[in-house]
A protein has these predicted regions:
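Core AdoMet radical
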Residues: 1-21, 25-73, 200
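Auxiliary Fe-S-binding modules of radical SAM enzymes
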Residues: 71-215
Length: 215
């Protein structure tokens, strides 16, 4: 109401009560939930939460209900200066007003991105999944569930940045990074299922710089 154009983003593990998320309705524009596991044995071992998938899947459903399918706008419509800066003030205002009224869906986002245009998400859900060592089959179950449940209603980010830390020494299978073969197997599976709205990570991105300072 007072001119704030930046979308409000909510970053979450998805291990949340639906009742809590309903309190956020109307305040959050973009949800960034994780969907870590489907297998209760894996979620119990690594997160002490046998009910993780039950809770997380219900939470994600509520997020999608709230914000709906993804929408994108030009970067300038989100409050940044862009290439219109070189135009006269009156022309720049006209361009800005036109772009503020242009909203793109996921398919149009893909097309314009490939053409070199830079769009920002205005609303939507991006579900993140971190591939972990020795968990390829469960990762496939995660991807399958998301695609069969939501299709093009969401974006899926398949992440390759798992970083082993000293605290994981009690789990020897987690003492290494995800191999290229493991990550590629998950990405290839998503492609086989027909994923359209997705993000992948290329190269070696497993670094401690991805881990926040929680202390």
């Amino acid at each position: 109401q007072q001119g704030l154009y930046l979308p409000i983003v909510y970053n979450t593990s998805s291990y949340e009560k639906v009742e809590t998320l309903r309190l956020l309705e109307g305040y959050v524009d973009i949800y960034l939930p994780d969907l870590k596991y489907v297998d209760s044995a894996i979620s119990s071992r690594y997160s002490h939460a046998a009910d993780y998938f039950t809770c997380a899947s219900a939470a994600i459903a509520e997020m999608v209900r709230q914000v709906g399918e993804p929408e994108f706008v030009f970067e300038r419509a989100a409050g940044k200066e862009g290439s219109s800066a070189e135009f006269p003030a009156d022309e720049k205002k006209k361009i800005s007003e036109q772009q503020n009224n242009m909203i793109f869906d996921a398919a149009e986002y893909q097309e314009r991105s490939e053409a070199g245009e830079f769009l920002l998400m205005r609303k939507g859900v991006i579900v993140r999944h971190l591939v972990m060592p020795d968990c390829v089959e469960d990762s496939k179950r995660v991807i399958s569930y998301l695609l069969k449940t939501y299709g093009g209603q969401i974006f899926i980010s398949i992440m390759n940045q798992y970083t082993p830390l000293p605290q994981c020494r009690e789990y020897p299978e987690l003492s290494r990074r995800v191999t290229e073969a493991e990550y590629d197997a998950v990405v290839d599976y998503a492609i086989e299922l027909g994923i359209e709205n997705g993000f992948i990570q290329e190269g070696d991105v497993a670094e401690e710089s991805f881990i926040p300072e929680f202390d």
